[in-house]
């Protein structure tokens, strides 16, 4: 069964906006400048993933681009891993999470490349 990439992208977008607002209003007085910068990076990249995932789903559903599921899975996993680990580091999470963050980034890149490949083949 193909996941509803549009729904998942919209959900990630909502979480991204909420995370950004929480960072600006709830964490600004509690985090140092570097940690706040990390939090903002996590929220921003979550939005990038949300928009890409929504676009992947929309174009896939319209039949403009076929075979988008691989891209969707990579974009979803990459967004969650990258943004999740960066946000955890901003909040003082264990430093070993820094070694996991590039896995999320690599999955995001793979998702964009798989989407490009699917678009090229369609």
Describe every region a protein language model picked out.
Residues 1-122:
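Polytopic transmembrane helical bundles with strong interfacial aromatic enrichment
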């Amino acid at each position: 069964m193909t996941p509803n990439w549009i729904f998942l992208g919209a959900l990630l977008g909502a979480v991204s906006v909420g995370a950004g607002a929480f960072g600006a209003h709830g964490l600004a007085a509690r985090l140092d400048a570097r940690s706040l910068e990390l939090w903002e990076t996590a929220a921003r990249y979550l939005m990038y993933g949300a928009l890409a995932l929504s676009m992947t789903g929309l174009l896939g559903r319209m039949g403009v681009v076929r075979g988008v599921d691989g891209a969707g899975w990579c974009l979803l996993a990459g967004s969650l891993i990258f943004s999740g680990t960066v946000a955890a580091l901003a909040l003082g999470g264990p430093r070993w999470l820094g070694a996991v963050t590039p896995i999320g980034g690599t999955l995001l890149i793979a998702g964009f490349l798989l989407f490009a490949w699917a678009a090229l083949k369609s």
